[in-house]
């Protein structure tokens, strides 16, 4: 066996990380899937798995600094994906896709955390991201958002 190969047990550990990343990414994408958004469960799970895979592979390279370079490139790649998602709505003049881009970026970070064996951080990140995505369906949040956007009378 050459120095670049890993044994079957290590490959199974990486495979279990990928499964964990898929589940966590799916958790983040669930609310979007439920409300028929373009980027949903499959997109978020795929981003999380990809980030975990790149990071896990980097952990087995001989060059220790390769991990940080690969993580940086994952962030950059997701940035390009996010840039393609954000657009300006010609009717309203508002930017669209910002939340999608931000949560896809966050989901990549969750995948990186899984790839680096930071499972508690990954789970906390996934749950927090899901909560933030689902806020716009909460009545209290909608009322609060509407209230703060109302102009105040200044006498």
Model-derived features: positions:
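Alpha-helical transmembrane segments and their membrane-interface boundaries
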Residues: 1-70, 116-117, 122-124, 134-141, ...
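Hydrophobic, membrane-inserted alpha-helices
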Residues: 25-28, 103-111
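Short, amphipathic, aromatic/basic-enriched membrane-interface segments that mark the entry/exit
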Residues: 36-43, 88-99
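Short hydrophobic alpha-helical membrane-embedded segments
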Residues: 43-48, 74, 96-105
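Generic transmembrane alpha-helix signature in multi-pass membrane proteins
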Residues: 55-58, 82-87, 106-115
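Alpha-helical transmembrane-segment detector that highlights a single hydrophobic TM helix
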Residues: 64-91
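Alpha-helical transmembrane segments and their membrane-interface exit regions
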Residues: 77-83, 128-138
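Membrane-helix boundary connector in multi-pass membrane proteins
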Residues: 93-94, 108-122
């Amino acid at each position: 066996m050459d120095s670049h190969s890993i044994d079957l047990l290590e490959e199974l550990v990486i495979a279990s990380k990928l499964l964990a990343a898929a589940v966590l990414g799916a958790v983040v994408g669930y609310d979007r899937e439920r409300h028929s958004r373009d980027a949903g469960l499959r997109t978020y799970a795929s981003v999380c798995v990809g980030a975990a895979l790149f990071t896990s592979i980097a952990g087995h390279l001989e060059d220790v600094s390769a991990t940080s370079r690969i993580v940086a490139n994952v962030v950059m790649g997701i940035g390009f994906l996010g840039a393609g998602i954000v657009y300006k709505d010609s009717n309203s003049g508002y930017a669209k896709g910002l939340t999608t881009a931000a949560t896809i970026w966050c989901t990549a970070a969750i995948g990186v955390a899984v790839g680096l064996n930071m499972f508690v951080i990954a789970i906390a990140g996934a749950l927090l991201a899901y909560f933030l995505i689902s806020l716009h369906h909460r009545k209290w949040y909608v009322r609060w958002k509407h209230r703060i956007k109302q102009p105040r009378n200044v006498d």
